[in-house]
Structures are given as structure tokens and as C-alpha cells.
């Protein structure tokens, strides 16, 4: 065996170079572990970073918003407010519904939060109304998170009440049991019930009241324990015909006797099978339907949950009659899969481009195969670690691997290029591999750890943004570490076995032409570098100018939070005048649906009218517009939204608010628009004074569009002003008045019908077909203490007033949300600043506090920490480089390349019309790690030349620049081509990936051009500074 000199021992690579079989098997093990890990990894749109969120819904039919707030919401809020780990509590109290949304700290497990919520509900039970039909129901779901799947159930042969009954008992319950499903809601409100519509004139003529009827019905329909008989030899269970099951049985119920003749319920009321709530409706396109929305639990994997639903659906639909049709109207996983597939394609494209650039520079197939093996091996091996860390295959981890393509090849290129140089000088391949790998080992370690140091601050980003990019940063760091291992083990071993002088000297026409081209480029660079070194102060002024320019660009570039994605689904809110009835709103909704369905980009539409846990008032409707796949429509979602709003503007009396659904949901409320700003006060009066003024001013700002608020205080109220003295004289209490009104107009649930499969309600109300509006109040009768019947009008006056349609709280205090969008020619940063400036001009009183919510609040938080994040990345890199070089000066030389990357990235973003958002900022941070590689490769060789060959600093850096020009250019182009597919992406989810690619490509181009000249000059200036400093210290010591 050839004896090698000490300088050629190969360092940490020697063992692997000398043991090719062991090295090969080790790499095979990494490959197999990565393949197994890839198959085991779940797929999702983004890392699971949801806040633990629980929604508590309480329904109290007939209750006003004020009653819901004071009697239901407030007692629950007081108990919930004592829970530990609660981050934010918001509530919405509307007519008959209270919805409380509890958002917990990211560190609190959802199951623990669930236990605390259940305990709080139990503690509040005694404080809630005694006639509450059902206790509060909680769901582990974020109401602002769009459904993962929407299904429409229709039938041409069956009434909707029967359809809902079957869907609820046979389909919804089974889907709710699937792991990951948080809530299954049935919109349409056609739950079966027996409806008793009292004829007010008939019961008045007979001297009866609605309370008499209610008492008779509740007493006639019971379902309670009756006991059993235990004899000497037999035990007998007692049962009775105490349950009435059908409308016909209730129709025959005797409610009173008059002159010894029975009065049956059918004599004074219309009794029929109907819906429990007649003021709810849902439509699929233009057809009335039961719409099933499936929402996931926070943290659940959306793909696996949707797959489980899809697998179960055929079995569930088989249990339904043939006339019932179940249609999947939307499935968010379709776009998620398409987005992930596009990102995977861009990853493969990046690998192909990187390998192509390697061949272009090396012009040798064996030399190209080596990094061609190292790149996929490093990426595939990363999957094994991702499984161990419980990560997923999502857009961000795939973006990390795509960017890593340009990173991981750098190490292999540097090793191959250095070993090839020694082989071309006449060294044997084995000796060249040992010598080249040993010489470059420290550079590889420096490159690796300085790059990972850049990613460290990402791990310490706070709140949801930090959680979001944790997987991105760690995935990229793991790929870089595996790349370093491969480059110090497999790559030199393959070089020793596959490269030779003959293979490197073997040239074809392309090789010779490209060699001449590179020689000319290097020669031109050498001439330019010599001139630059002769004019250092001019070059230094250019470097300082880039620093100043980067600061100016940072200040003036439009800033955003997260790119608006086109996921093919639009959420909409339809708003009508505040006094609109259910019938009126349903008619308007159908008019709007006709307009929307005419748009060529729209595939289907679901809409919902009525008050329940998702819709706050009768004058609003919820819509979900499902667009055709991206390749089947001409326009992206923002243009479709603009076109739809223009078309719906022609429908009189309605306002339509639309926003595209996003993979990242930070809000906890379903909002009309993408962004929210809240005003909070201690009383509703303060809000009623200032909210309209602020909204009016904000609507005039060009930086905002679709400005509206959820403050609706013009809801019509018929105020029953009871003369308490007169009522007391007649023996009539306020409870009697409330009961009479509730019986007549509250769709009161007065009894329950129990069956083997479900429970159904008996609904009591007055038949108001012949006495619409306020005239119906004249039919109300009450019973006095002597048994007489007293008209309500004799003891009360009816006053028409205005009152809020809903009352919203944030952390137990009244709040109003102002919603807004941002026009195309402005950024979120512009909008936020405009709102803050307008707020200052109003001089709001001190008892009103304002705050941005949802993604706008996250934007402010992320923007505030961005500068510190970049500073932390620079400091971390300085510390690592200082430790590696045992120098305070050389790390500064290396870091001097950073402003050029910032200028290039910011200029590219501005030229492309992109905002400086979180994704683009991540790209800039990655650029900090990339561009310093050029300086590291130059400085490493310059220091070695000074130390080992005795060169002067100028000659050393000049030779280092020429010697390392080709690998510097190669690695930069590899990183650039790795980011190029992201910059040019046009498929599903491209909006998320493009800012990262644009920033990195722009930064790499500018930094490549400038750092080749500025780094040598700064190196020499700092070298002179170091010599001057040493001489000063030496002089002081001599004088001392």
C-alpha cells in the first residue's frame, strides 16, 4: 500500500475512503431508512400549528340577544375565564344562540383543555335558565377553520325532515366517530318535530290560554321510570302508554272540558309533522338540501381524516333510500394534494437542474454521478429523521428540501472540485482523495455549521409563526447535516474509485468549448479583480452603498403577513337590511345564488340562512363557493372574487363579502373579510357612539376595501311595556307574561318524543298567518287570579324600538369587529398604518381599546420580531465563525457579503410585485447562510496560502479568488437553480412558494456579482487593520 504523507491523511474522511464496502452499506442504510420514512410520513398542507380551540354552543329558541348574553353567555364566560392556559375568549350572543370560542395557549394539550371546559360547564349549570332545552355543547373545533369536506344530501321523493333524520342518525354520527373529526354540522334545520300552531281566536273564544295548552301537552307526554313488581316467583316491569309519537295522537289529545264536552288539541290548533325550526334553510346550488359540513379537530391531519371519510361514505350511503342523493361538493384535500404534488415536481425539477449545472461545470460523467448520488441521498435520508420528529410532508417541508437541493450539492461540489484538482496535477486518485478531502474538511464543517447557525433563530420564533417554520428549519438543517456527512464519507470514497486522470482529461467538443469559455471568464475575472484591488476605497464605497440601499428598500417595500392562496374555495357572507325576515332573506339568497352560478369559474355553491351556531342573525347568510380546478378556469381566485362582487352589486338590498379560504387559519371567528380590527369597551353605548364614526372614516381610505363592522343596533324590537300595578291587581306576574309570549312566538320546545334511535321535539307557537307582524300581539291572552282571561293589551303597551341583533364579547367585555380587505395596489402594512393613523385622528376615549385580530395581529407580531430575527441570525453566524476561525476579524469579512443578498432579494420582490411577507423573510434569512459560502471558500484558501506558502495577503486572496472561482460559481448557480422552480411555479399553492424563490434568486444573482469583488477588498482592509492594531499594541508594550 502506498505510504501517504501526514498532510494527505484525509482527516475524518480517511476511514471511509479506505473502507468502501462499509461506506456503501452505511449509505444504503440511510437510503432505506429514508424510503421507509417517506412512506410513513403523513401529508398535509402546512405543519400542524393550530391553537387548541374549543367552541361552546348553547341554543335557547326565542331568546333575544340581550337575554342570551345575560342569562347564558355571561355565566358561562365567568366560569371559562377562570381556566388556566386560556389565551383568548370570544363570544357571540344572537337571537336564540350563544357561541363561545375558547382559544388556548399552544403549549396546552387539547385533551386537557377539553377537561377544563367540561368542568366549567358543569360549574355554570345551576346559573343557566331552568327551561334551557339542551345544556351547552362543546366541540373541539375552530369555527373559523373552513370545513375539510362539504356534502349535500337531497331527495326528490322525501321531505327534508325525513332526509335530515336519516342523515343525522345514519351518516353524521358515524362520521363524527372518525379520528380527527371535530364537528359535523347539519345546515338546513329540517330536524323532524311535531308542530302545534295554536289558533289564538279559537282558544280565546273557549276561555283558554296558550299556557293551558302547554301544561296539558307536557302532562300528557312523559317518559319516566315506573318501577317494577317483585313477586314470589316472577318480577314484572311496569310500563304505560305515556308517550305520544305522532301528530295524529297529539291532535286527539284532550286539553280541557267545557260543558262536559272534551276540547281536543285539534279543535284549537293545527298539529302537523314539520321541522323543529322553521327559520332555517340550506341550499346546494339551487336545490334545497341538508348540507353537512365536516370540520377537523385542531391538530388533526386533514388528509388522513378526509381519506377516512371517503372510505366510509359508500357504506353509509348504501343504508339510505335510493331517492336520497349524497354529493361531495367540496373536499379541501383535493387542492392540498395538488399543491403537494406540484411542490414535489418542483423538487424533482430542482434536482435535475442542479445535476445539469454540475455536468456543465465538471464536463465529466463520473464526476457528475458523484454529486448526483449525494443530492438525493441527503434528501431521502432526511425523511427518516422527519418521521422520528413527527413531521409531515407538507408545502413547507417540501420547500425546505427544494431549497436544500442547492445547499446539499455545494458540499459535494467543493470536495469533488478539490480532489479533481489534485488528480489533474498528477496525483493518484486515492492519494488525491485523501489529500483533497483532508484539505477541504474544515471548510465543509465551517460551511455546514455556519449555515445551520442561520436557522437557529427560526426555532425561537414565538407564537404560531415560530411553530409554523419549526419543521421548515429543522428539515433544512437535517438535510444540510446529512449532506455534510455524505460529502465527507461517500463523496471522497467515490472520487477515489471513479475519478482518474484519463476520465478527467477525456474531452469532447462540448467539453473543450465550455473549458475555453470558463478559462476566458476566469481570465476576465482576474483582470477585473486586479483593478478592483488597486482601487479598494471605491469598492468599499460600493459595499457601503449596498448596505444603505438594503436599509432603504427594507423601509419602503410593501409588507404583508402570509401570501393569499388560491385553494379553490371562497367563503361568503351575504348581508341584508337589519329588519329582514327569514322569508325575505331566503328570497334574496336565491337571487344571489342565481348570479353566482352563472360565473364560468364556479363549480358549485352551498348557502345557508337562519340563526344557529354558525350564522348570527336572520339578515345574514353564509355561502361557500367552490371553484373549478385551477387548470379548468382562466382566472385566479382574487379576480373571480372581484367579478362576483361586481355581478352581485346589481342585486338590490344586499351586500356580499367574499374571501378565499386559506390553509393557515389564525382567526377564531368567521369574518366577512380577511382582516379584522376590534374596538372593545366596558359598555355598548360607547361602541354605538364611536364605531360608526370610525367605520365611516375607514371606508374613505384607499388602502382599505370592503370595510364593514358587525355592529348592528337597528334590529326591530317590539317592547312590551307592562303596567306592573295593573298586572299585580289581576294576579298576573311577569313570568306569566313571558310564558305567554314565549308560547306564542318562541317556537317553544315544550315536550320530547323518545324513540329507539333519536329524540324529537314538540314545538308550540301561535298560527300567525292571518295576523302578521305586531298585530299578532293583540291575540295574546293571560289568566288572572280568579280564572278569567285577560288580553295582553289591557295591561301592556307595545313600543317599537331598536336593539342590537347580536352582542359580541372579547374576554368578557363588549367588542365590535371591523372587517376589511386590502386592494391589489396596497399591502397589509399600508392598511395597518392607515388604520392606526385614522384612529389617532379620532381621539377615542380611554375606555375604548383597539386591537388587530387574527392574521393582522400575527402580522404585527411577526413584523416586530423580523429585524431581531435577522440580527439574531447574523450574531449566531458570527459566533460560530469566530469559534471556527479563532478570530474576531475574519467572521466580519465573511458577514460583509450579507447586504448584497438583501439588496438583491428586496429588489427582486419589488420588481415582481411581491410583498415582503413571512415567506420572503425566511428566504432572506436563508440567503444569509448561502452568500457567506463564497467568502468562506475564498478566505479559507487565502489563509492556507499565507500560512503554508508564505504568500502576502494580497497575492493569497487574489489566488484564492481565481482558484475558487469555479466552485463558487458552481455552488451559487446550484442554489439559484434549486430556487428557480419555486420562483416560476404556477400550480396550486404557487402563491405560497413563489416569494421564497423570488427572494433567493434575486439575492443570489446580485450577491454573486458583487461579493466576488467586495470580499477580497474587505479581506485586505481588515488584514491591514489587524496589522495596525497589533503594531499599536506592540508600541504601547515597548513604551511601558
Curated annotation (Swiss-Prot):
It holds the Pfam family ACR_tran. It is found in: Cell inner membrane. Keywords: Cell inner membrane, Cell membrane, Membrane, Transmembrane, Transmembrane helix, Transport. Gene3D superfamilies: Multidrug efflux transporter AcrB pore domain, Multidrug efflux transporter AcrB pore domain like, Multidrug efflux transporter AcrB TolC docking domain, DN and DC subdomains, Multidrug efflux transporter AcrB transmembrane domain. GO terms for molecular function: xenobiotic transmembrane transporter activity. It is a multi-pass membrane protein. Induction: The mdtABC operon is transcriptionally activated by BaeR. InterPro entries: AcrB_DN_DC_subdom, Acrflvin-R, Multidrug-R_MdtB. The chain crosses the membrane at residues 16-36, 347-367, 369-389, 396-416, 440-460, 472-492, 537-557, 863-883, 888-908, 911-931, 968-988, 998-1018. Its main location: membrane. GO terms for cellular component: plasma membrane. PANTHER family: MULTIDRUG RESISTANCE PROTEIN MDTB, PTHR32063. The MdtABC tripartite complex confers resistance against novobiocin and deoxycholate. Part of a tripartite efflux system composed of MdtA, MdtB and MdtC. MdtB forms a heteromultimer with MdtC. NCBIfam families: PRK10503.1, RND_permease_2. Belongs to the resistance-nodulation-cell division (RND) (TC 2.A.6) family. MdtB subfamily. This is Multidrug resistance protein MdtB.
Amino acid at each position: 500500500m502506498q505510504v501517504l504523507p501526514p498532510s494527505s491523511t484525509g482527516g475524518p474522511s480517511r476511514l471511509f475512503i479506505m473502507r468502501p464496502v462499509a461506506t456503501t452499506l452505511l449509505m444504503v442504510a440511510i437510503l432505506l431508512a429514508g424510503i421507509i420514512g417517506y412512506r410513513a410520513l403523513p401529508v398535509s398542507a402546512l405543519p400542524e400549528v393550530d391553537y387548541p380551540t374549543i367552541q361552546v354552543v348553547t341554543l335557547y329558541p326565542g331568546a333575544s340577544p340581550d337575554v342570551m348574553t345575560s342569562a347564558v353567555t355571561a355565566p358561562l364566560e365567568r366560569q371559562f375565564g377562570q381556566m388556566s392556559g386560556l389565551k383568548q375568549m370570544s363570544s357571540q350572543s344572537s337571537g336564540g344562540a350563544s357561541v363561545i370560542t375558547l382559544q388556548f395557549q399552544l403549549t396546552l394539550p387539547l385533551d386537557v383543555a377539553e377537561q377544563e371546559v367540561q368542568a366549567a360547564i358543569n360549574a355554570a349549570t345551576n346559573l343557566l335558565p331552568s327551561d334551557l332545552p339542551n345544556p351547552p355543547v362543546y366541540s373541539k373545533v375552530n369555527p373559523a377553520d373552513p370545513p375539510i369536506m362539504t356534502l349535500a344530501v337531497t331527495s326528490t321523493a322525501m321531505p327534508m325532515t325525513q332526509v335530515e333524520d336519516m342523515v343525522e342518525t345514519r351518516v353524521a354520527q358515524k362520521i363524527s366517530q372518525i379520528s380527527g373529526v371535530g364537528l359535523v354540522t347539519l345546515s338546513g334545520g329540517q330536524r323532524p318535530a311535531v308542530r302545534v300552531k295554536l289558533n289564538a281566536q279559537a282558544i280565546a273564544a273557549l276561555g283558554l290560554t296558550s299556557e293551558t295548552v302547554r301544561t296539558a301537552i307536557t302532562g300528557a307526554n312523559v317518559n319516566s321510570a315506573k318501577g317494577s313488581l317483585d313477586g314470589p316467583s316472577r318480577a314484572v316491569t311496569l310500563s304505560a302508554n305515556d308517550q305520544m309519537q305522532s301528530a295524529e295522537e297529539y291532535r286527539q289529545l284532550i286539553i280541557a272540558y267545557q260543558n262536559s264536552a272534551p276540547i281536543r288539541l285539534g279543535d284549537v290548533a293545527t298539529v302537523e309533522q314539520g321541522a323543529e325550526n322553521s327559520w332555517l334553510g340550506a341550499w346546494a346550488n339551487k336545490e334545497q338540501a341538508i348540507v353537512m359540513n365536516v370540520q377537523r379537530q385542531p391538530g388533526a391531519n386533514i388528509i388522513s381524516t378526509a381519506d377516512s371519510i371517503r372510505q366510509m361514505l359508500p357504506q353509509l350511503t348504501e343504508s339510505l333510500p335510493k331517492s336520497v342523493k349524497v354529493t361531495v361538493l367540496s373536499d379541501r384535500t383535493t387542492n392540498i394534494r395538488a399543491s403537494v404534488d406540484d411542490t414535489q415536481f418542483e423538487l424533482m425539477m430542482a434536482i435535475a437542474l442542479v445535476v445539469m449545472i454540475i455536468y456543465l461545470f465538471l464536463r465529466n460523467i463520473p464526476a457528475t454521478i458523484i454529486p448526483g448520488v449525494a443530492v438525493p441521498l441527503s434528501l431521502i435520508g432526511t425523511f427518516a429523521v422527519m418521521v422520528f420528529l413527527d413531521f409531515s410532508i407538507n408545502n413547507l417541508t417540501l420547500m425546505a428540501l427544494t431549497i436544500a437541493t442547492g445547499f446539499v450539492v455545494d458540499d459535494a461540489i467543493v470536495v469533488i472540485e478539490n480532489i479533481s484538482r489534485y488528480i489533474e496535477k498528477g496525483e493518484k486518485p486515492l492519494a488525491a482523495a485523501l489529500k483533497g478531502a483532508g484539505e477541504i474538511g474544515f471548510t465543509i464543517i465551517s460551511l455546514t455549521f455556519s449555515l445551520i447557525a442561520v436557522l437557529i433563530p427560526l426555532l425561537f420564533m414565538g407564537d404560531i409563526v415560530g411553530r409554523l417554520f419549526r419543521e421548515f428549519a429543522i428539515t433544512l438543517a437535517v438535510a444540510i447535516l446529512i449532506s455534510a456527512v455524505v460529502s465527507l464519507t461517500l463523496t471522497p470514497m467515490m472520487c477515489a474509485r471513479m475519478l482518474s486522470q484519463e476520465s478527467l482529461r477525456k474531452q469532447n467538443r462540448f467539453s473543450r468549448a465550455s473549458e475555453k469559455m470558463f478559462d476566458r471568464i476566469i481570465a476576465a475575472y482576474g483582470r477585473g479583480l486586479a483593478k478592483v484591488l488597486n482601487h479598494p476605497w471605491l469598492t468599499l464605497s460600493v459595499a457601503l452603498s449596498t448596505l444603505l440601499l438594503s436599509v432603504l428598500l427594507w423601509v419602503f417595500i410593501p409588507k404583508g403577513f402570509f401570501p393569499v392562496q388560491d385553494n379553490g374555495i371562497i367563503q361568503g357572507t351575504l348581508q341584508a337590511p337589519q329588519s329582514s325576515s327569514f322569508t325575505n332573506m331566503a328570497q334574496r339568497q336565491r337571487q344571489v345564488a342565481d348570479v353566482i352560478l352563472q360565473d364560468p369559474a364556479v363549480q358549485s355553491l352551498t348557502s345557508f340562512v337562519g340563526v344557529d351556531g354558525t350564522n348570527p342573525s336572520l339578515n345574514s347568510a353564509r355561502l361557500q363557493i367552490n371553484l373549478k380546478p385551477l387548470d379548468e378556469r382562466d382566472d385566479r381566485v382574487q379576480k373571480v372574487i372581484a367579478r362576483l362582487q361586481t355581478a352581485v352589486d346589481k342585486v338590490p338590498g344586499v351586500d356580499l363579502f367574499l374571501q378565499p379560504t386559506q390553509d393557515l387559519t389564525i382567526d377564531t371567528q368567521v369574518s366577512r373579510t380577511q382582516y379584522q380590527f376590534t374596538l372593545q369597551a366596558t359598555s355598548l353605548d360607547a361602541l354605538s357612539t364611536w364605531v360608526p364614526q370610525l367605520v365611516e372614516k375607514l371606508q374613505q381610505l384607499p388602502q382599505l376595501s370592503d370595510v364593514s363592522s358587525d355592529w348592528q343596533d337597528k334590529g326591530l324590537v317590539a317592547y312590551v311595556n307592562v303596567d306592573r300595578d295593573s298586572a299585580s291587581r289581576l294576579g298576573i306576574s311577569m313570568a306569566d307574561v313571558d310564558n305567554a309570549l314565549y308560547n306564542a312566538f318562541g317556537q317553544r320546545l315544550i315536550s320530547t318524543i323518545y324513540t329507539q334511535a333519536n329524540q324529537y321535539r314538540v314545538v308550540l307557537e301561535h298560527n300567525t298567518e292571518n295576523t302578521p307582524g305586531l298585530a299578532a300581539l293583540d291575540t295574546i291572552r293571560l289568566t288572572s287570579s280568579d280564572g278569567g282571561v285577560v288580553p295582553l293589551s289591557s295591561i301592556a303597551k307595545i313600543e317599537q324600538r331598536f336593539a342590537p341583533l347580536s352582542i359580541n364579547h372579547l374576554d368578557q367585555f363588549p367588542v365590535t369587529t371591523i372587517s376589511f380587505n386590502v386592494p391589489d395596489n396596497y399591502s397589509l402594512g399600508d392598511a395597518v398604518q392607515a388604520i392606526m393613523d385614522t384612529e389617532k385622528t379620532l381621539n377615542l376615549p380611554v375606555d375604548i381599546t383597539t386591537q388587530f385580530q387574527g392574521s393582522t395581529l400575527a402580522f404585527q407580531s411577526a413584523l416586530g420580531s423580523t429585524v431581531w430575527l435577522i440580527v439574531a441570525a447574523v450574531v449566531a453566524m458570527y459566533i460560530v465563525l469566530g469559534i471556527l476561525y479563532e478570530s474576531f476579524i475574519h467572521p466580519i469579512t465573511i458577514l460583509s457579503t450579507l447586504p448584497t443578498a438583501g439588496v438583491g432579494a428586496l429588489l427582486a420582490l419589488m420588481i415582481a410585485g411581491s410583498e415582503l411577507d413571512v415567506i420572503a423573510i425566511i428566504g432572506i434569512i436563508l440567503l444569509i447562510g448561502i452568500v457567506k459560502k463564497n467568502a468562506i471558500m475564498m478566505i479559507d484558501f487565502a489563509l492556507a496560502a499565507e500560512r503554508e506558502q508564505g504568500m502576502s495577503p494580497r497575492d493569497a486572496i487574489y489566488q484564492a479568488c481565481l482558484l475558487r472561482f469555479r466552485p463558487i460559481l458552481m455552488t451559487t448557480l446550484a442554489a439559484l437553480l434549486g430556487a428557480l422552480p419555486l420562483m416560476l411555479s404556477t400550480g396550486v399553492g404557487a402563491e405560497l412558494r413563489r416569494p421564497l424563490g423570488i427572494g433567493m434568486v434575486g439575492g443570489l444573482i446580485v450577491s454573486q456579482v458583487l461579493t466576488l469583488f467586495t470580499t477580497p477588498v474587505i479581506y485586505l482592509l481588515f488584514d491591514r487593520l489587524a496589522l495596525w492594531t497589533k503594531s499599536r499594541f506592540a508600541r504601547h508594550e515597548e513604551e511601558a
